[in-house]
Amino acid sequence: MVNPMVIGYIGSAAAIIGFGSNYVPVKKYPVGNGLSYAFILSIGGLCVAFIAMMIHGTFVFSPIGILGGSLWAMANLLIIPIIKLVGLGLGVLLWSSIGIVVGFFSGKFGWLGLEKQIVTHDWMNWLGFVGIVISIFCFFFIKPSLEDDNNNKNVVDRFKNKKGGYIDPMDNEEFPILRGSVNSDGPIKFNKYNNNNNNGDELETSTETIFDKIPTKFKKVAGISMSIICGVLLGVNMIPMQLWKQNHQEASPFDIIFSQFAGVFLFNAFTFMFYAMIKKSPQIYPKTVFPSFISGVMWGIANCGLMISTQNLGYTVGYPISCSGPMIISSLWSVFYFHEIKGTKNLLILCGSFLFLISGIILLAFSSF
């Protein structure tokens, strides 16, 4: 029989890789305001939950699990705006760190009905928390480079033909992964560009989004504010499941996993349907559907890994490892692939942030031993 500790670390590895990479498949595809992306992502996650439920052989459908999934879905709707405003690396660093802090206080003080967690070395517990707070403060000084996203606002001009009309850059082989999205204020038909007359005087849609309209000097403030809200929601989204487990001591996290994932799906489904009824021309990009589904599958596997890790390694070990590791992975993507974080100053700040963050996580993890 496999050692539970080994299973726990395998779960942590799945969570770290999955959470740190699950937004990469859609990073260079147009997602508009993110509503259709979130809906398709939830379908991918629900498929993973269904498979996990079948493997585990149990099924529990609890309203409290639906609540937890809905809290996560609310946070997820903020992900696309955050990535557009401050980049993938900095965004994940912020909301993940804040989520860890919120989770720390929730367990430390027994917020929202949770049982207070008593640790062996309280001083180490608090010192670890301070290390995380310092790392979050350091993240504010990182200035990601998002020139590629800003340049996409004018990309449509490169597709203007001699007759004044426009062709769809999504269909052009030169730009197979165009990041620009459609103006949410105008009607759209699968991101097609149409002119209202033969002279091409007016364009029905553009690649500009509401996020592109935010003045540059306010983008970072808006992105950081959304990251804080997102982090809080992520930090409390597992509390409903923990409350359920307090009343079912012998239960496995997999017993309620389908309810948690169903909450994510139902919230996104209702949100997207409401948006479609109000907007009447929702932003749907055919080429983004499959990457969104893959993103959802990766998230679903990562979330299952988090549950396995927490169950086998404990909340003070499995949870910090699984929630801090993705920040490193996402930053590596941001530095080496997307080139959002570059420059000696930014890289030094990033390394310093990691030093405090990793030290804090280690102290938190070992404070109960």
Swiss-Prot record:
Its main location: membrane. One of its GO terms (cellular component) is membrane. Pfam families: TMEM144. Keywords: Membrane, Transmembrane, Transmembrane helix. One of its GO terms (molecular function) is carbohydrate transmembrane transporter activity. The keyword Membrane applies. It comes from the Eukaryota. It is a multi-pass membrane protein. The chain crosses the membrane at residues 6-26, 35-55, 63-83, 85-105, 122-142, 221-241, 256-276, 288-308, 318-338, 347-367. It is found in: Membrane. Belongs to the TMEM144 family. This is Transmembrane protein 144 homolog A. It comes from Dictyostelium discoideum.
